[in-house]
């Protein structure tokens, strides 16, 4: 039988399998952060258990951290408790921790790949839904719950049902100013937030092949917003070039052996997929979400749809509810929407290529005085903040009026100091826009880094026309 990439990785990690039942899979890499791990470690202590493979377990602080200070007290008492507990847990169980004093500290789904922890063919888990990001390297990666975190800590295995295979081929010649974020938002808009439920999605096609690793990570990161368990892109020369020489990547003769194996991690011709889709993105424009779900998305030059556009009564009611919450009227143009804040960051779009693309838009420009704009590099001295400062990107952002912050999840979620106030509207490069995601009453519009940068005049602007716009 011809196997898909997913089936190859799944089968290679089976520890135990019973007919018509879930398999027990070996887990190659377990990533932790301060929010979803404390209860798991407490349970280990109560049951007098140890971590089976501490060298295959890595932790970082990202969700709760202050992005204005490295002071553990800066994010409030609850955040401090969670971070202190993570320090205690990692010390007791001999787990490597990227804490606030570690210059390599950053967002978990940024530091994993940049340090070479993430490798093709691996199984990777984390107590975070956007673990699908690592699938960009041809790794089977997915988010898990706290009870599963405990199970992996103790056994280095996890019970998993086989999932269905979905293939999404992306073809066409991308126009200027259209990004990976636009492509994946467009696909989510077509398939819906449950379109990938029960599936592992493999992305392929000429457009994917031409993407750099940062762009591929954006695509796989957002696959979870289609309801998919995981996403995969077959490793190729782009993957190998990114990984070579990184701290935890194989070295010397082991590198050559690894690449030889990684080249076998492709879906065989005529392998079976339960569903297949092909999208031509040749005529795609920059995308922006208008509602409270990632699939409520339009091209920047379109109008908010009339409720009668939706034939399905559920979608019609959701659209009406979204417009009420977002304070938008059907028939209004997206370019008429005024914003209060700009956020460039998150595990979706805080990597060096994201910063470079936004900096090109912002060079020699100034944000409006009524706008607050913050930029969050995804990591410290790894591949983002320090390299960006060496290139002078920080100066471009600061000169434009942005706050150049420390690594962390920040305004992606209303869990730290960086929140929207009630009624505030944000152009955000994050991944979720449900009610209150960025703060109670906050209104989130998901966009690419360059579209976020183009919103500097206090409203959404088609980045392709930015030079013709004025304050």
From Swiss-Prot:
Protein name according to UniProt: 3-isopropylmalate dehydratase large subunit
GO MF assignments: 3-isopropylmalate dehydratase activity; 4 iron, 4 sulfur cluster binding; metal ion binding
* UniProt keyword annotations, A-Z: 4Fe-4S, Amino-acid biosynthesis, Branched-chain amino acid biosynthesis, Iron, Iron-sulfur, Leucine biosynthesis, Lyase, Metal-binding, Plasmid
Q: Which organism is it from?
A: Buchnera aphidicola subsp. Rhopalosiphum padi
According to the record's subunit comment, the protein's assembly and interactions are:
Heterodimer of LeuC and LeuD.
On cofactor binding, the record's note says:
Binds 1 [4Fe-4S] cluster per subunit.
Protein family membership: Belongs to the aconitase/IPM isomerase family. LeuC type 1 subfamily.
* UniProt xrefs under SUPFAM superfamilies: Aconitase iron-sulfur domain (SSF53732)
Show the InterPro entries listed in the entry: 3-IsopropMal_deHydase_lsu (IPR004430), Acnase/IPM_dHydase_lsu_aba_1/3 (IPR015931), Acoase/IPM_deHydtase_lsu_aba (IPR001030), Aconitase_4Fe-4S_BS (IPR018136), Aconitase_4Fe-4S_dom (IPR036008), IPM_dehydratase_rel_enz (IPR050067), IPMI_cat (IPR033941)
| Pathway(s) | Amino-acid biosynthesis; L-leucine biosynthesis; L-leucine from 3-methyl-2-oxobutanoate: step 2/4
């Amino acid at each position: 039988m011809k196997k898909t990439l997913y089936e190859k990785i799944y089968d290679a990690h089976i520890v135990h399998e019973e007919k018509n039942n879930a398999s027990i899979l070996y887990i190659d890499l377990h990533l932790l952060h301060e929010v979803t791990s404390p209860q798991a470690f407490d349970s280990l202590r109560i049951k007098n258990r140890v971590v089976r493979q501490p060298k295959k377990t890595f932790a970082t602080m990202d969700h709760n951290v202050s992005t204005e200070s490295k002071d553990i007290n800066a994010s409030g008492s609850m955040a401090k408790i969670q971070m202190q507990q993570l320090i205690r847990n990692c010390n007791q169980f001999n787990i490597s921790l990227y804490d606030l004093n570690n210059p390599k500290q950053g967002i978990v789904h940024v530091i994993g790949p940049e340090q070479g922890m993430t490798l093709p063919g691996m199984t990777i888990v984390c107590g975070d839904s956007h673990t699908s990001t690592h699938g960009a390297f041809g790794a089977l990666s997915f988010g898990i719950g706290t009870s599963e975190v405990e199970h992996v800590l103790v056994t280095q295995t996890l019970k998993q049902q086989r999932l269905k295979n979905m293939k999404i081929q992306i073809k066409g010649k991308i126009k200027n100013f259209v990004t990976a974020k636009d492509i994946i938002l467009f696909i989510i808009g077509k398939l819906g937030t449950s379109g990938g439920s029960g599936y592992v999605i493999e992305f392929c096609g000429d457009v994917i092949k031409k993407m750099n690793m940062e762009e591929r990570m954006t695509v796989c990161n957002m696959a979870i917003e289609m309801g998919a368990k995981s996403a995969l892109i077959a490793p190729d020369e782009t993957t190998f070039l990114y990984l070579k020489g990184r701290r935890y990547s194989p070295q010397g003769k082991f590198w050559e052996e690894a690449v030889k194996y990684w080249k076998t991690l492709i879906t065989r011709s005529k392998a079976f997929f339960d569903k297949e889709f092909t999208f031509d993105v040749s005529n795609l424009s920059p995308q922006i979400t208008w509602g409270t779900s990632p699939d409520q998305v339009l091209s920047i030059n379109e109008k908010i749809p009339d409720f009668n556009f939706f034939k399905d009564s559920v979608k019609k009611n959701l659209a009406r509810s979204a417009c009420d919450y977002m304070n938008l009227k059907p028939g209004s143009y997206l370019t008429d929407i005024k914003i209060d804040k700009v956020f460039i960051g998150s595990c979706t779009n805080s990597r060096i290529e994201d910063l470079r693309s936004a900096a090109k838009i912002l060079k020699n420009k100034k944000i409006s005085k009524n706008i607050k704009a913050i930029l969050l590099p995804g990591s410290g001295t790894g591949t983002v903040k320090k390299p960006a400062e060496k290139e002078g990107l920080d100066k471009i952002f600061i000169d434009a009026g942005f706050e150049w912050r420390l690594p962390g999840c920040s305004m992606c979620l209303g869990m730290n100091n960086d929140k929207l106030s009630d009624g505030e509207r944000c152009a955000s490069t994050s991944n979720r826009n449900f009610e209150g995601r960025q703060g109670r009453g906050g209104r989130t519009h998901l966009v690419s880094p360059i579209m976020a940068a183009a919103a500097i005049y206090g409203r959404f602007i088609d980045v392709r026309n930015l030079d013709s716009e004025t304050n």
